[in-house]
Amino acid sequence: MKRMLVFGLLLGLLCIPLSVNAFELGVRGYYWLPELDGEVKVDESGITGTTIDFGDDLGMDDEEYPIVEAFVGLGDHHISVSAMQVDYSGSKTLSTNIIFKGETFTTDVASSLKYDMIDAEYQYDLIDLENILAGFSIGVIGKVKWVDGEVEIKSAIETAKETFTAPIPMVGAGVHVGLIADLLEVRVKGTGIGYSGNMLYDVMGDISLTPFPLVDIHGGYRIIHLDVDVDDVELKYDMSGPYVAVTVGF
């Protein structure tokens, strides 16, 4: 599949041999518990769609998702690639008719929201005081978020599906603060983009403990916000919630 090929190529970049002075190399696994809040509206052939709430109208519930990240760094340069698969589903007896992509639904419906998200990120540290006291750094971030998925609604007699695929460039900043040298650290980073009334941002922050060498344990919070109106599709979408993570680095 195209999205898996993209992920494989990006991971391949991380395997390019670096000099012995490589600053970091490792993997990080997250377990994220986000709340879902969003709505979608899809027009078709001049037929105006209904603004449909994922939870209230379609019965989608919150889910929990693993995220896998690989990272490498050399001096002030840091590269990471992460991947997540999202799969929401729900069923609902409609209290009023809804129109989605030109189709009218009047009774019981089943729905799904599925997508793969791959983040390829580069950070350059403008300020790096990692060798002073407990450590402190500030960096600028450039990121491409690749999203590939679909929204589907179906009843006993009708089915309608809208697919979406997009590489989204984003910029932002990251801050790292060491509280206790080699033991306790805080990390905050955020990226985003806004244009023509559309907006996307991805913000996360955590505190990590290093119980023994090469292993960090994290607890944090992440927010992904999307608000776009492109062609015949309007999508407002928020995922936000706490996460835990484990890093193994060298």
Language-model segments: residues:
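Outer-membrane beta-barrel "beta-signal"
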Residues: 24, 119-120, 209, 238-250
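Membrane-embedded beta-strand positions of outer-membrane beta-barrel proteins
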Residues: 27-29, 70, 79-81, 122, ...
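Transmembrane beta-strand segments that form the barrel wall of outer-membrane beta-barrel proteins
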Residues: 183-198, 223
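Residue-level signature of outer-membrane beta-barrel architecture
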Residues: 31, 72-74, 124-126, 144, ...
